[in-house]
């Protein structure tokens, strides 16, 4: 059987390698219709088939598309990053390294702006393709929930060809970081809802609001960054692909991505659609709810795969509370959390055609945010630390009495990719 290429996580220096994959779906089509009634919205099951509806099928050359981007010299970026010093390194992985730096503002040379400089590792053709992809996509798209690409550099120096990208600096790091034990900051429930909303807006723009469709293909919490106001923005488009051409339902491609986020039909067939991103978004919602990673080998065996772990707890409210992120310390409206889980469940239908489009997902999330805002001023600034969270402990304002809100669960299958 064909082996599929995955990245097994965000470990430092980890390269994509063939691995065996086991993914399970949460819902059957019938169950998704039942859970969706929470929103009093039209049934979206089975109504969506992917078509580009006239979207373009090829990209113009980088040189014509990158006209809005600033071209940096390697000297500029060495100066900006203290010669790529480890003292200003803010990220490292199989793709290369990211450095914090400062560059002069083009409109006012006396003003310096903070930037993030991504130095791609020397991975031959694949590394160059991912660099070109980022320049192609981010050179022409602009949205408040996408990290802005400011410029690029492709230049030879004593170490050979250097491929670099320069982004707006995102001071509050990634959502993945703040959900991990490494962070002393606690993302409040209100802020998690806004992050879910921001991420849905970004994906909706990519899928539906341009003349061509972009499929992210590597949607995950480590690729969702937070600006100084804690607004979430999607980043890292090196694996992104154009959506299907007119008249086609999917793109056939090598299977790449991150363990725990890839849709089962994509793993099995290599057929990529925007519904693959919708699946990944559903996984991400359970990350926000539980504070856990999709795959965590450091946990006990029965808790290592997030979707498998949550499944037994979803049948009634009392059990459901046991999967909520303990760092929230009970400060959430339980109905709000349940409704977000319903959205996640819609995204995790095994039949990809029965999953909602991202615009429909966004509409559902918007309703949850609006209802949450109606309960008082939302707490959008995270708590400073776990201790501060304990000191501010209050009563759980959630309610009970909604046993069976989830419905019967689908019996999962194991899918082996190799």
From Swiss-Prot:
GO terms for molecular function: ATP binding; protein serine kinase activity; protein serine/threonine kinase activity. Induction: Induced by infection with the bacterial pathogen Pseudomonas syringae pv maculicola strain ES4326, but not by microbe-associated molecular patterns (MAMPs) such as flg22. Keywords: ATP-binding, Cell membrane, Kinase, Membrane, Nucleotide-binding, Phosphoprotein, Plant defense, Transferase. It is a peripheral membrane protein. One of its GO terms (biological process) is defense response to bacterium. PROSITE patterns: PROTEIN_KINASE_ATP (PS00107), PROTEIN_KINASE_DOM (PS50011). Its EC number is 2.7.11.1. The modification Phosphoserine is found at residues 373, 377, 385. PANTHER family: OS01G0588500 PROTEIN-RELATED. This is Serine/threonine-protein kinase PCRK1. The lineage of its organism: Eukaryota, Viridiplantae, Streptophyta, Embryophyta, Tracheophyta.
């Amino acid at each position: 059987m064909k082996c599929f290429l995955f990245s097994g996580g965000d470990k430092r220096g980890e390269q994509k390698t063939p691995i065996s994959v086991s993914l399970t779906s949460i819902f059957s089509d019938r169950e998704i219709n039942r859970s969706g009634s929470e929103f009093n919205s039209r049934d979206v099951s089975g109504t969506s088939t992917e078509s580009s509806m006239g979207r373009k099928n090829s990209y113009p050359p980088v040189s014509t598309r990158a006209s809005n981007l600033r071209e940096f010299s390697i000297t500029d970026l060495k100066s900006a990053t203290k010669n790529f010093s480890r003292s200003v390194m803010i990220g490292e992985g199989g793709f290369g390294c990211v450095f914090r730096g400062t560059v002069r503002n083009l409109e006012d040379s006396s003003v310096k702006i903070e930037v993030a400089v991504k130095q791609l590792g020397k991975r031959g053709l694949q590394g160059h393709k991912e660099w070109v992809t980022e320049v192609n996509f981010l050179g022409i798209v602009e949205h408040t929930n996408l990290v802005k690409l400011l410029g690029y550099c492709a230049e030879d120096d004593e170490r050979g060809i250097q491929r670099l990208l320069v982004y707006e600096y995102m001071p509050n790091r990634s959502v993945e970081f703040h959900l991990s034990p490494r962070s002393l900051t606690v993302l409040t429930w209100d802020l998690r809802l806004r992050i879910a909303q921001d991420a849905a807006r970004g994906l909706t723009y990519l899928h539906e609001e341009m003349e061509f469709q972009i499929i992210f293909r590597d949607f995950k919490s480590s690729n969702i960054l937070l600006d100084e106001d804690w607004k979430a923005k999607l980043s890292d488009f090196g694996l992104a692909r154009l959506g299907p051409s007119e008249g086609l339902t999917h793109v056939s491609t090598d299977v790449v991505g991150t363990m725990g986020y890839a849709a089962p039909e994509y793993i099995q067939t290599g057929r990529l659609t925007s519904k693959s991103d919708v699946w990944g978004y559903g996984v991400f919602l359970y990350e926000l709810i539980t504070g856990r990673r999709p795959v965590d080998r450091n946990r006990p065996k029965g808790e290592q795969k997030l979707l498998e772990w949550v499944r037994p707890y979803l049948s009634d409210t009392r059990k459901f509370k046991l999967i909520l992120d303990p760092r929230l310390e009970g400060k959430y409206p339980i109905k709000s959390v349940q409704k977000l889980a319903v959205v996640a469940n819609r995204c995790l239908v095994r039949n990809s055609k029965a999953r909602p489009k991202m615009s429909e997902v966004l509409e559902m999330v918007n309703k949850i945010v609006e209802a949450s805002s109606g309960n008082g001023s939302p707490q959008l600034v995270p708590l400073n630390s776990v201790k501060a969270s304990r000191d501010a402990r209050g009563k759980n304002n959630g309610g009970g009495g909604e046993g069976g809100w989830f419905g019967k669960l689908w019996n999962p299958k194991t899918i082996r990719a190799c």
